[in-house]
Structures are given as C-alpha cells and as structure tokens.
Amino acid sequence: MNTSQIVVMLCFIVGVAQTALAIKEDDCEVCVKTVKRFADTLDDTTKKDYKLIETAFKKFCKTQKNKEHRFCYYLGGLEESATGILNEMSKPLSWSMPAEKVCEKLKKKDAQICDLRYEKQIDLNNVDLKKLKVRDLKKILNDWDESCDGCLEKTDFIKRIEELKPKYSRNEL
C-alpha cells in the first residue's frame, strides 16, 4: 500500500469513529429533550445572545421538576448549583447548534448529565395494580401531585388510584 491509500483509509476510519461517537437522543434523553424544549421557548433576539440565553435558562429552570430539575442543577441553572457549565450550553445554542451536539459537548464536560434517564411510564389501562409494589403505587400518586392521607396498606393506595384514574388516565381510541 502506498502512502495515499493509507491516508484515505485513516480518514475513513476517523470518519466512521466520529459517526459512532455521535450522541443519539436515547443515549442522553433528558439532556436532548430538555435542551430542545428550552430552545423552542426562545425568541429570535434571545437566540443570538448567549448571556440572554443563560438568563432565560435560569428562569426556565425555576419551573422544572424531577429529572429536568436535576439537569438544571448539573448545568448551573439553579441558585443552589455547586458548579456552572452553563456557557457550554448557551454559546452553542447561540450558534444554532442542534440539541444532540450541545449534549455531546456537555457530556465531555460532565458525564453524569447523560446518566439522567426518564423512568418508564406505567400504562394504567393495562397494568394490574395489585401486582405493583407500594413504592410504585406511591410514585403514581406522586407523579399526579396527589396524596393518600391515611393510606397504610396496599389496598388503600390502590383504592385511591382507582378513584383518581378517570381524572389522569388518557384513553386512546
């Protein structure tokens, strides 16, 4: 093999490696979805200035819960955040970089950002509540921002969920 063939092969291998390393939405789902949702809230003026993006992100973070709230904490979007790598998100967003690429950059700075995962949703129409653990029943109520005062046993939680089910379950046709 001559030198030019080796160079071509090397370039090909590097290109394949870069494609394989590219982050996918499933690899970093909370980051990608949160960045996309946040970017969709920005107006054209804000999108061009990374300082305005940072201010808007801090305001956005005040309304977030659960995994998104943790994501904001990792980035430095909350007052109680220990570290701040907010500019690693705001500057690329101001350049109109896609969410997947932004999250790829963030992952290089802090790997735990991509460790955040959404929990699997329980399909209430097809699940037997009696087979779930009390912890899962409590989680269902917590996700609905409901409480079960006086619930001590599993049957109490099931009864409360059955009462609230029509209010929260979506019937798909």
Swiss-Prot record:
Localization per Swiss-Prot or TrEMBL: Secreted
The disulfides recorded in the entry are C28-C114, C31-C103, C61-C72, C148-C151
Q: Which GO terms describe its cellular component?
A: endoplasmic reticulum; extracellular space; synapse
Positions in coiled-coil regions: none
InterPro entries hit by this protein? ARMET-like, ARMET_C, ARMET_N, EF_Hand_1_Ca_BS, SAP_dom_sf
Q: Which residues does UniProt assign to the signal peptide? A: 1-22
Family, per entry: Belongs to the ARMET family.
- Stated name of the protein: Mesencephalic astrocyte-derived neurotrophic factor homolog
**Which organism is this entry from?**
Drosophila mojavensis (Fruit fly)
- Give me the gene this protein comes from: Manf
